Structure formats: C-alpha cells, structure tokens
C-alpha cells in the first residue's frame, strides 16, 4: 500500500479518538462498548511494525517485503455493563475470564498466520494463540477481528503482549524469530486500575448526603411556602397562636415576592439534583447509578420532604428562611428576570374569596371543628340570608292570629287574647283579612278596664301603631336593614296577583315576617319561649310542652295576684301620688287607670331569698339594684315598705331611704312638661324601644340605690305611664253613642266572634300582659333632711297618714 494511503488510514483512526468509548459500528452488536487504541504516531507504528520478523528487508526481494502484515492499532470492545480503563502506563485493562472482542488495524492483515499473546518478552512462550484460519476475520485487508478470553495475570507480570506471525509462501525461506510489539497500545492487562473520583471518596459521599438534604429542602419549601398565600400569612399574623405569628412574620416578606421565590427554589433544586446525579454516577455505573440517584432524589428529595412541609410548612419555612434568602441572592441574576417576566404575564397572585367560596369554606370547617361549630353555623347563616327572600322565612297567613276591628275588649276577650300568647296582633276591617289596617299590641291593654268594653278599633285609633308591608320576594338583608332603622319589628307580607299593565296592581296577604324570623335564620336555630306554639314557622313543628296562660289573676275582679299589695296600701299610695306628684293627678291620669297602674307597678324584693351580698357594689345581685350611678334610667320609684341604701358623692356617703321616699322625680317633670307630645302617634312598643327613641324622657342619677332589706316599692316606667295616660285619654274622649252601642251589642257580638281560629304562631311572642310578681327591686334610706329633699322626698300628708291608720285598723 502506498505511503499516502497509509497516512490517510492513520488519520482516520486518529479522528476516532484515542481510547474513547463509542458504540459499536458496522455490524458490531449494540450491547458492546468500544475502546479504541491508536498508535501514538502512524509513522512510528509503520516503521516499528513494517517488518515483523527479525530478518532484514534486504534479505528479501521487494515483492516479498511489501506483503508483510503491519499492525497500526488495536481496539477492544467490551459489553456495556463491563467497565474498563487504563492503568498508569496506558495499558488497556480488561476483565479476566470474560470474552471480549479485539479489532486490529493495519496492512496486509490477510497475510497473518497467527497472533500470539505472551506475558514475557519471548514469543516462543505463548499464553494464547489466535489462529487466523479458524478465529480470524479479515475485512478489506486492513481490518481484522477476533474474540479473546484472558486469564488473570500472574503476580509481578505487567501485561499481555502481542506477537504477529505472518504466513510463509510456499518455496519461501522460513522466517526467523519474532518478537512482541513494543507499542503499549497493543498490550492488554487484567489488573483493574483504581477508580478515580472528583473528590476523595468519603468527601464525595458526604457531599451527596448534603446535596440530598438541600434537594429535600428546596422541594419541601417549593410546596410548603408556595401553598401559603400572603393572605393566609397575614391572617395567621393577626389571629394565630403566638408561635405561628412569629413564623408567619418571618416568611411574609419573602413570600410576597412569589415568583422570585419560586424561580430561586426551582433553580436551586435543579442544580442540586444534577450534581447528585453526577456524583452518584462516579460512585457506580449502569443500572446501579440510575437506581441509586432516582431512589435518593425521589424518596429523600421529593416524597418525604413534601409530605412533611404540607403540614409543617410554616415551621419549616420560618426556621430555614436564612437558607432561602441565601439561594435567592445566589440565583438572583437568573431568577429575577424570569420572575419579572412571570409578573408581567400572570399578574399578582393575590386572590380574594367571594361570598360563596367563603361560605363553603366555613361549612367544611364546621364538620372538622366541633368546638366552634355553633359559631360557624351562625356565620354561615349570616352569609346565607343574602340568598333568601321574605317568603322563605315568613309565617303563612292561615297560621296568623288576627282580629277584626269590631272586636269588643271585655274581660273574656282579653283573657282569650292573652292565652294565645301573641304580643302583636294584626287587625283587619270589613271582615276581609287582606285589608289589614292596624296593629294591636297586647301591652296596650295593660291598663284598660275590661268593663269599659272598648273596641279594638278604638284602642288602635289612639295608639296608631304603624303597619309595615313588604313584598314576598323582598331580600332578607333589605328587610333587616329596615328593622334596624326602627321601622318596627313585624311586617305583613303581600304578593302581587295582578300583573296586567292595563289595570292597577292588586295584592293579597300571604303571611307575616318578624325580626325573630330573620334572627333564627342567622343563628340557624329556632328561638322558643313560653308563648311559642310551633318551633318552625315553615314546617310547623309543634312544641310539645304545655302552655300555662292563666290570665284571670290579671283581669278578674275578686282575686288579686299574690304579689299585689294590700288594698289599704294601694289607697294610701294613690293618695300620696296624687298629693305630691302632678303627673298622677286627675288632669293626667284617670283614677281607675291610676289604681291599675299602682297594682301592676308594685314590686317586692325579698333579700332573704337572694344571695348574701358583700359591701362591694359589683357583688350586689341584679334584682337588688334600683339605680346605678351615671347609668340612664326611665324608672320612677316610690318606697312603700322597707328601706333602700343610697350611695352618693365621690366619697361614697351612704344613707338609707325609708317608706314614702321617692326617686326619679326628674322623669315625672319631663312627662308633665311633654304631655302634649305623648299623643296618639307615639307607638309604645316597650321600655327598651322607647328609651332608644326618647332619651329625653330618661335621667342619669348621680347616686346608686340598692335594696339591703326586704322592701316593697312602686316602679313606674315611662312606657307604663304613657300607656296609662293614653288609656285615660280613651276613656275621656270615647263618644257616648259608642259606649251605648258597644254595651248593647257586646253580648251578641261576643257570641258570634271566635277569637281562636286554629291559629298558628306569630313568630314574635313577648312577655305576659302584666309584669311578673317579683321584678327588679330598688333601694334607699336617709336621715339627712337636705339629702332627702335633694333626692325628691316629700313628706306624707297628715290626711293620708290618718286614712292609712284607719284602714289598717279595720279587720
């Protein structure tokens, strides 16, 4: 072969790369890995191997010399799972007792007779002999392959060396002695070279463990921190435990930069995982490296840390916030531009919960937290009313107790009304229940004499309680706002039945709705008291308890309630009030009405039945407190029996007030001065509602009054006085013909009137018509005349004292 061809072949082999690992090509099996050994110099190889035998080329003719086989290089192909290397001298190392493939390159390889492997310098001492006839495969005269299996080299032996024995043509002289090739690239050894690592083995193992910890940290923080939204962290800071607040405060500044934090954590996680794979591949190869790195990263770097950070993300994030900030700083040049791009594309990550989502979130929390389930139900109820309308909570009209305006309020009728247990009763005209015109409050009947036979129309005409109407599709929040503004706490519900544009709209009453119905929807529970007949207006679930509404003791003429004061004491109290307070005289209150007011306003406090009271006013039982310093009050107090202790001034001076001492004269003065404003238009619903509307009729005492011993006294509230005043007006202004007509027709009318029409409940029952026998007590006792006059005490008239003594002397 020409020198140019030789150089071309040598250059081609050099391009393959000296001792590089490549896949087998040109028919070589895919499972093998190629090791290429190239001669250091093609020219040197040609010179060294141009003549394999020891005879000189001058002893042969030119034709014979050109046919001598020449070896340029050798390549060893091993299985992929069989690693190989080179020892410190550059000799290729193979695994002993395992077959491998050898590829040799050169010229005139078809002229090779045998290839001999020896571990000495003498080719006549072969260790292995490869016969070209049986084991040799030549490709185009410049490439040949064969398979070889080597035993472990003996000790003190360095390598197997190759000897090439050429073929001898017939008639040619025999070859002389052959020697091993001196090129170490054609040598083989079975000694395994020591494995080289990037770092010392112990340090590399420690680095892998450290990187696994970082991988676990980044993976856990990516899930743990990113699952904590800034809103949740702010919520924890404001309402969480002290430890949680501290953790959230550390995380929040970093978490607000969400995309920057995400990019830094992901970038750090990728870098660490890549480093783990590289270092793990240095420790082992093949399937073992794959399994080791995968198991380490997946189990210790992903599954375990993420499962922990899902539940403990707040604590883990707070304790590792320094490491997180460090990696944000290290990855800032790359992470910051990416995070800004994400901010522009995706926008802010703040997400506000709408009402429905928040409501469903609370509902899910109810089943998980039994301790606060009631509070959560109330919250859900308050949010759900926005989706409800009046017809969802109203009491149907067929279950409403109503009265015609012609009903005569005699004793029997009043007792039946009280037995029904309703405090606000719709009143209709002309026998048409759709024509509700007024509202009768049972409290308006408290001071009426049943023998006067007033009609419902007359009573309603004086009080004129407004009647509120709402549509059945009115949202509950709108109705609640109306109730909050003081527009009553009960409304009649109507429904539009005529939708024709050509005619005026017409309506029909379909029910009644009260503030209690809305409160029940908010509380998600029924509110029952002693006057409820059903516990659910919609489903009509009846209450099984038996009601006791005996009203005869309040309206009977022969038997007074046990808590009422004696007749003699009533007469003396009436005379004292008329003599000493202008507001109780005939020009304001009728005598019969005043008598009923005294009977209904009598209170008795039995101190022996109360708890032992200390000197501290805070420990005084509620029933024993009459007045509290600097607290608004609407009560006028007159002591009949017993004593009340009064504490006055900044020094806490205490005095005792005895019988016929009174308190609250300021209220009576205001009522007398404002009698003209207590007309028909004022609707007296109750003490609390009146106080909210007319604070000008209240006073603020600069003293405290407490009952310290058994005491009987009159407690007349502003609302009770105004009711008595209106009752007196009705008796004075009632036309005579109305009295005669009512007296003439009362028996017939009552026989035909059925007050109880199987009524269902109106959902706002209130207290009994007459106050309880034992109510809030009062207290005072004084010896200083100046103090008594200052508190409004008046001496009892001598005539009153004589009459009282005379009455007491009677059997």
Swiss-Prot record:
Residues making up the signal peptide according to the UniProt record: 1-24
Positions glycosylated per UniProt: 20, 49, 61, 122, 435, 453, 745, 752
Residues spanning the membrane: 205-225, 260-280, 285-305, 316-336
Pfam families recorded: CNNM
Domain of life: Eukaryota
Biased composition (Low complexity): 743-755
Location in or out of the cell: Basolateral cell membrane
Domain CBS residue range list: 394-456, 462-530
UniProt feature coiled coil, ranges: none
Cellular component, GO annotation: basolateral plasma membrane; plasma membrane
Biological processes, Gene Ontology terms: determination of adult lifespan; magnesium ion homeostasis; magnesium ion transport; positive regulation of gonad development; positive regulation of multicellular organism growth; positive regulation of vulval development; response to magnesium ion
Major site of localization recorded for this protein: membrane
Keyword field: CBS domain, Cell membrane, Glycoprotein, Ion transport, Membrane, Repeat, Signal, Transmembrane, Transmembrane helix, Transport
Residue intervals annotated with topology Extracellular: 25-204, 281-284, 337-811
Residues annotated as domain CNNM transmembrane: 197-376
PROSITE patterns on file: CBS, CNNM
Start and end residues of each stretch annotated as Disordered: 741-760
Tissues and organs where the protein is expressed, per its UniProt entry: Highly expressed in the intestine and in neurons, but it is also expressed in a variety of tissues including the pharynx, hypodermis, rectum and in muscles.
GO molecular function annotations of the record: transmembrane transporter activity
Recorded topology in the membrane: Multi-pass membrane protein
Function of the protein: Probable metal transporter. Probably acts redundantly with the other metal transport proteins cnnm-2, cnnm-3, cnnm-4 and cnnm-5 to regulate Mg(2+) homeostasis. Promotes postembryonic gonad development by regulating Mg(2+) levels, probably via AMPK signaling.
Listed PANTHER family: METAL TRANSPORTER CNNM, UNEXTENDED PROTEIN
Entry similarity comment: Belongs to the ACDP family.
The protein's name: Metal transporter cnnm-1
Gene from which the chain derives: cnnm-1
